[in-house]
Amino acid sequence: PVTITIEQPQGAELPLEKTGEWRVATTLTRAGAEPLGFGDYCAANYDELIDHPVELGVFDYEAFDVDGVPHAIAITGTHRGNISRLVNDLKRICATQIRFFEEPAPFNEYLFLLRVVDSGYGGLEHRSSTSLICNRDDLPSANEPNAPSVGYTQLLGLCSHEYFHSWNVKRLKPDVMVTPNLRQPVHTELLWFFEGITSYYDDQFLLRSGVINVDAYAKLLSQNITRHLQTPGRAVQTLANSSFDAWTKYYQQNENTPNVVVSYYVKG
């Protein structure tokens, strides 16, 4: 077992008046700490410890329930987003995914950690949470129409993608990722399945949950197909090789990448 103490930052660089409103957002098990508070947290082992990201600072926090499972979102960064709209849409997406698998959710709670920046996009799945980054303008506006904007649709798709990984990657995973060597890249030929299948379903769950309509989904699907057909590398690299070479090619792109690499997200 691992027990850690998260202390409130102090010192000349971070005077108390600057950190007095700081809170802690994580799904680590509390071992004496109050909800959102500094103090003791614990994990069963090191693997569990590093799979629970921690957000420290001033953030907006909204809790909500999905099929009896506590969920929450912590948003860090200046924004003018309509958080009520975001929470309502997330509830629909999450509920649709849980019911899709026809079994209880594989976690006791879930946390979306969202960092809002001027320009950025991405996410990483964890066993009961996800770390996300998005553009400030991607958040829904106060007068967001029923049909989400392009940026907001992209954000919802990202949330849907990482949430689906709770099943497809965190529960179902390649054998080399069950007990991975964290000192070096771990290679597998199956990323096309774990990322490709997830990418197929992320936007589809926006449709299934009613967050977007059929026309909006068809547009997203056509954009992905067009992106794939316009990539010459689709006729050069196999999905297995694309998966295996992710560390050395897909994430180290150069001017020739489109000619020799195919996306295991899109084609998968």
Segments (PLM) and residue ranges:
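Generic hydrophobic alpha-helical segments
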Residues: G11, P104, F205-L206
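Carboxylate/His-rich catalytic cores and anion/metal-binding grooves
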Residues: A31-D51, C94-F101, P106-R127, V214-L229
